[in-house]
Every structure is written in C-alpha cells, then in structure tokens.
C-alpha cells in the first residue's frame, strides 16, 4: 500500500519543502488507496518549546478522489504553530489504527513504530532576500600563505621562511594530532591574490573566501592576535584596501573567516608570551580582557578549544567581549565598513544563539546585502551542540552553512556508486532547509580541514601511515587518471545543485594532498593540469549564462549506481545535469529537445565517465527521460 504526502501554498505545489515562513498557510494532503478504507486521518505535531508531553493535533477531512486514491487534507496556519522546530506523524484509522511517517522516497509515507521516522517541519520567522549577488556565482577559498607570493611583505620575527614554493614540505607533527609550531611560511599574501585576480575570474568566481588574515603568530591565523589589524606578512591593511578596490572593479565580493570562539594565547587579549604592549588576561586578573576567558586555576589552567593551549576559548556571552566584536566601532562594523561582504564563522556550533543573532544584526546594519556563513558539519536545521538545539535557520542567525553533508554524499556516489546516500542527502537538504538558506549553501568538495578531493577520489584509506610518509606520498599515474575523471563528474554536480559552489584553491588544477597540513601546499603556478582547469572554466561560464542557477528549483530525475540526472528549473526553462559514472556508454531519449549548454548541440549519448549539462524549454513536469545501456 503506497501512501503519499503533498503540500500546497495557495495552490502551488511545495511538496519537496519542509520549512515554511510563519506567515504561510500550508495545505497538507495525504493520498492513499481507497481500498484501505480509511475512516480518519490525524496529524500529531510535536514541537520543541511546547510544554513537555504536549502536542498539536490536526484532523484531516476527505476532500476528493484521485483515480483509485482518496485525498484527505488540512490547512495549517504556520503562525499558529509558531516559529520553531517540529516533528510530526500521521495516525490513519481503518479497521485498525496505525501510524505513518517519513519514507525513503520524496513525498512517500511509510508505516512506523512509536516515534521512529517522524517528519521534520521547520517554521522560521521570514524569508530572507540577503546576498542576492551570491546567487548564480562561485566562491574561491584561499589559504592565503599558500596561494601566491608577491615578494612585497617582510617576514616577522620567529618565523621560518620556506623558499621552496614547488617542493617544500610544511611543518607536521610526529604523530597525527600532535603539536606543531605552525610558524613556517611560504610567503603568500594579499598582493599575491591581486596579481592572480584575472586567473580567478576565469573560473567564474564572484566571491573570494579568505582564510583568516588578522594579525596572528601562525601561518593559518586561527590563533587571532589582533582582530583590528591585518597581518603584516599578508600586506597589512594597505594590501586589503587594494584587494577590495580591485575585486570591486571586477564585480567580485570578499568574505572573511571570522574566528570568534577563541583567540590566540599569543594575542593582545591573552598575551601569554608578552609580545604585545597590552595587559593580557594571562598576565593579570585586572586585565580588561580577563572576564573573556574561563580560568580554572589561574593563570595556567584555562579552557581551550579542544584542549589546544595556544587557543584559549572566549565566552561569547560575555558582554565586554560582545561589545568588542559586535558593538559600535567593533570588529564586525570596522571590516564591513571597510568594504568586505560577510563572514564565515569558524566553529559556529560553539557560539551562542544570542551572539549569532547580534552578529547578524550588526553586519546587516552596515550592509543589508551582507552574508553570514557558519561552519557546521552536519544537518544544520536540527543540530544539537553541547546538549542544546541550535536555531541557525529559524531566523536572523546564519544565512547559510558549509555543505559538508553533500560533500560526503557526492564522494560516496562518485567513488562507490552509493545512490541511496546521494538521494537521501538531496531529500534532506530540500525538505529540512528553508529555500533561502539552501540557495546560499557553500557547496564544497574540499577545504583546509579535509583531504584534497583529488586525493580522496583516487586513493583508499591511509590509516596507519605516518605524517612523514604522507608528506611524500603521491598518487600513481593510474590513480591520478581515475581521480581526474571522477573530480570532473563531482564538480559538475556540486556546481549545478542548489547553492553556490566553493572551489578550494588548487583543486581546479589537480592539487593533491592528504590530511592537514598536506592539503595546504603552495599553488603550483605553471604546472597546472590544463584538462581539469578548462573543465572548471567551462562550468563557470555555464553557471553565469543560465539563470536557473540563481535560485531555480531542484528536481531529482534519475539516481542509480550508474546514472544521475537532476534538473534546475523555473516557470519557463530548465537545465538537466546528466552524469554517467560507469565505464559503459549510455544513450537516452527525451520528449523535449535538450541541447548542450556548452555547445548548443543536441546530445543523446552519455560517454563513459562523463557529465553533461543540457538546456530545455517548457514545463519540467512534462519532461520524460529514458536511459539505455549501449
């Protein structure tokens, strides 16, 4: 017995969505076979924030017959439900009563026991229209010290300069997770980025996402020394001014990596090493920064991020700290007024809801079109961190997040053919995330925190290898060839689903690398893999020319272990991304003419290990595709 759920708002089918603005009235429909003899259907809605053991109950009424099915419906006013995260199930009464909840397929309901398989419903404050400039664009994530060296910036004291740009090995711990000084630099800087803006633009990039650039001791700068200054080894504020000016000429934007959960121990605020003129919290309880930190036994026993002693954790609810970061003349206001367009928030899970709301409000007060991203590794719609449910998408906290769940799903599909995981992840993102948040998702294949995507696709587990071994390990020619083919399939997917693709510098030219720090090597200027680069550039042009990538709806058409097909569409036109991850050729037939977005030629064959992005006109619901193995 197949039972389905559909949802409508003012007659418009919104069945794939499960997150709605509180001002909407949603018409819920349950469709089930007449032969089951249903006499009543009731929705049981459980909400966080509602008194314990209480729920809302909605009785559905029979409204029509569709073929051999009965349709029961109930209009539910989201304003009366209230902003929050909810879960629901249906009770269906026939000659017996049973419950149905979320099925494996989109809009499918299945029998459940107790509260297993409840369906998620999110009610948020209001739809956001921020950062429309991000729609249809591409982000480029730069680890500044390793991108391009201008030679204009002098090293600071206590720094090790590695002058071997192409073959130099970064510092690494004797054992994974061990201590690393992280004071070895290769010399990349903001002036170096300016020199390569034409190259970056050729990828279709519209936004630079910079690793932290505030003054700090380390090469990665996650140990902030001074939030109010740009590190001199990156060119100081003068270089940032020049970068902002040059990016604006090209219609590009910049977002900073904001590290507000912890500072460096070597900083104005903590000053453990005494390298700053300030009175740091480590030096005196009379320090203006003392209350920012949690000392268990002053001064050497203090709370740190993941027990890393050089990263003392701050209390994001401390009022003086909030004033410093979020207040008038504070960190957010200064850099937004300088001309950047937003922040990616490091370890957003560890920042309080109040801090996130205040940050978003301050940022938007300076630039209403600015954006706030959060580093969240799981489903951000229902994340629990430190035993507390986060409220990222209920309104005025995060505009979107880094899409790590989708990265894992792509890898699992492209590398192993796991279509079920890919399908379920697409379903989760569509039904759990408000559309305005999903349209801004940072869709990534790699970051400074992951192995290089090419390495992931081309090799198996390296558990048991030492860092010394990994520092020298590279793929064989056979592994590289296979990884290269898979990478292009993966990028075709990540660049055409809802959200914004984010390229980790060097992925587009075939950079390899295992875990940190080997995923942060210098960019191989002059030694790029032209085949991968040209593919990325082609995708960039397609994203720019096709309007459906600026917020078009998403439909998954085919998803098995060999063939993937999905559409982006609006009322008038659509694109279809077709991926053949198998080693065999497939043909396909379509009732609507489909032409390549790249060549404008009609395509009916999918070569082995290939991806095509096609364009069609008309109603996506009328599109029929059939695939045949040749």
Regions found by a protein language model. Name each.
Residues 1-27, 50-141, 147-165, 171-173:
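The feature marks proteins involved in alpha-glucan
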Residues 26-34, 577-579:
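Short edge beta-strand/loop segments characteristic of extracellular beta-sandwich folds
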Residues 30, 142, 200, 210, ...:
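Conserved, mostly hydrophobic/aromatic
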Residues 244-253, 261-262, 267-278, 331, ...:
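Active-site-proximal helices and loops of the catalytic beta/alpha 8
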Residues 602-630:
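C-terminal beta-strand-rich structural cap/linker in extracellular carbohydrate-active enzymes
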């Amino acid at each position: 017995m197949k039972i389905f759920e559909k949802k409508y708002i003012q007659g418009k089918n919104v069945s794939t969505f499960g997150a709605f603005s509180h001002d909407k009235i949603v018409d819920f429909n349950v469709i089930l076979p007449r032969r089951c003899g249903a006499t009543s259907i009731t929705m049981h809605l459980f909400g966080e924030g509602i008194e314990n053991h209480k729920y809302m109950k909605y009785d559905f009424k029979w409204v029509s017959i569709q073929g051999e099915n009965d349709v029961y419906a109930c209009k539910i006013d989201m304003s009366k439900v209230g902003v929050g995260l909810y879960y629901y199930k249906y009770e269906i009464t026939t000659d017996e009563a049973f419950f149905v909840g979320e099925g494996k397929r989109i809009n499918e309901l299945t029998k459940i026991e107790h509260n297993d398989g409840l369906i998620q419903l999110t009610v948020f404050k209001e739809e956001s229209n921020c950062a429309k400039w991000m729609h249809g664009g591409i982000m480029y994530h730069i680890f500044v010290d390793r991108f391009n060296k201008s030679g204009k910036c002098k090293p600071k004291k206590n720094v090790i300069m590695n002058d071997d740009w192409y073959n130099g090995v970064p510092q690494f711990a004797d054992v994974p997770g061990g201590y690393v000084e992280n004071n070895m630099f290769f010399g990349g800087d903001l002036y170096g980025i300016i020199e390569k803006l034409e190259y970056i633009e050729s990828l279709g990039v519209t936004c630079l996402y910079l690793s932290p650039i505030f003054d700090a001791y380390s090469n990665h700068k996650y140990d902030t020394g001074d939030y109010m200054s740009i590190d001199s080894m990156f060119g100081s504020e003068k270089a940032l001014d020049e970068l902002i000016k040059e990016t604006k000429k090209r219609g590009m934007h910049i977002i900073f990596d904001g590290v507000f959960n912890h500072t460096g121990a070597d900083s104005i605020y903590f000053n453990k090493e005494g390298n700053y003129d300030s009175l740091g919290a480590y030096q005196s309880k009379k320090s203006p920064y003392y209350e920012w930190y949690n000392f268990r036994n002053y001064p050497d026993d203090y709370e740190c991020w993941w027990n890393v002693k050089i990263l003392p954790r701050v209390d994001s609810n401390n009022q003086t700290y909030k004033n410093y970061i979020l207040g008038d003349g504070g960190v957010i206001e200064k850099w937004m007024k300088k001309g950047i367009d937003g922040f990616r928030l490091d370890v957003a899970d560890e920042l309080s809801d109040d801090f996130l709301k205040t940050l978003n409000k301050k940022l938007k007060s300076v630039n209403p079109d600015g954006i706030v991203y959060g580093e969240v590794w799981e489903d951000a719609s229902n994340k629990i961190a430190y035993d507390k449910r986060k409220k990222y998408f209920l309104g005025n906290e995060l505009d979107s997040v880094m899409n790590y769940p989708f990265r894992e799903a792509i890898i699992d599909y492209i590398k192993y053919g796991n279509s079920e995981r890919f399908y379920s992840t697409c379903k989760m993102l569509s039904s759990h995330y408000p559309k305005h948040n999903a349209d801004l998702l940072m869709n990534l294949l790699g970051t400074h925190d992951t192995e290089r995507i090419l390495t992931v696709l081309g090799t198996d587990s390296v558990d048991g290898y030492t860092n010394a071994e990994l520092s020298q390990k590279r793929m064989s020619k056979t592994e590289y060839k296979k990884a290269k083919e898979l990478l292009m399939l993966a990028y075709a997917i990540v660049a055409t689903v809802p959200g914004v693709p984010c390229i980790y510098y060097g992925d587009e030219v075939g950079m390899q690398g295992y875990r940190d720090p080997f995923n942060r090597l210098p960019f191989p200027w002059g030694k790029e893999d032209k085949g991968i680069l040209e593919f990325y550039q082609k995708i960039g042009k397609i994203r720019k020319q096709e309007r459906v990538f600026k917020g078009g709806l998403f439909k998954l058409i085919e998803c098995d272990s060999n063939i993937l097909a999905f559409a982006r569409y609006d009322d008038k036109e659509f694109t279809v991304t077709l991926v053949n991850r198998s080693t065999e050729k497939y043909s396909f037939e379509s009732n609507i003419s489909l032409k390549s977005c790249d060549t404008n030629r009609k395509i009916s064959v999918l070569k082995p290990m290939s991806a095509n992005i096609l364009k069609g006109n008309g109603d996506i619901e009328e599109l029929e595709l059939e695939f045949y193995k040749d």
